[in-house]
Amino acid sequence: MLSDIIKNILTIDKRNLKENIRPMISELKERLNSNFDLLKEANNVDISKNNGFKLDLNIINNIFANVLKEPFTYGDITVSFKDDEKKIIYGKEIFDVGNVIVINEGNFYVTLELLLRNLLAGNTTIFVNYGYMFGSNNFLINEMESILKNYDISQNLFQIYVTEDYDEVLSYNANIDLIVCIGNKFLQNMILRKSKVKTIITGYDNFDLYIESKVNLGFLNEILKTGLNINLYIKDDLNLNHSQAMLVHDINEAISQINYTGNRYSSAIFTSNSLNASKFINEVKSKIITIN
């Protein structure tokens, strides 16, 4: 029950956390590499239930590499000013945010990266989703719990709660310090509207693709096989059959739809028309825009 999870996170002792963050990250990386066959078994169960995509160890290791580039962790003291005359050094200690709720669709790569980043920050974290890739995510959390136990740190530092009732989750606002919502625009708006605590929303790892010509279709098909969260918009006269795609009449309708219903994280156009490519770059509201 969520009430039990919330109760557990209120009594977590973090005294052993500071000096063990990076060793634990290194150990988690080693475990996922050495036990990748076991992770694949859990992943294959997800795939067999149409509840996940095939994991790639190279992507997993890239996530670790990127996170480990972060210079500071929970408990570090950073120097902001040094007064040589008075022989005083001014600085600040990095504290945790507190109790963080991460609401996302369950993508394993997102769970892994957010687990690592919240570990760096010393945050207690509950991952809330509707059960997508549950086997893979549960394997990850179990490995992390085992590592935490070995370092004499509460295993409740990271937990998963499976639900579609986000109202229940948000009702515990008195015990939540931050909500991070990662998903499509509908989910973002719903959480933002109902949340009573500080909330960060992002379309991270959600993509909008507009196809108006058949250039690079091989590359497109490879992208669609990755399991990424993709909104696909196809020009209606191309006769391309994708059941999840939205058909649009032209570049203007595509841009309007992406700006209205898109995730505003990453958008791409597949085109051979340089004018339309330029229009797409200038008018689409996304953090990342690419041309293919």
Where in the sequence are the language-model features?
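Short, structured coil segments at secondary-structure junctions
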Residues: 174-175, 194-196, 284-285
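Hydrophobic/aromatic ligand-binding patch that stacks against planar heteroaromatic rings
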Residues: 117-119, 190-191, 280
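A structured beta-alpha segment of the ubiquitous adenosine-cofactor-binding alpha/beta core
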Residues: 85-92, 158-177
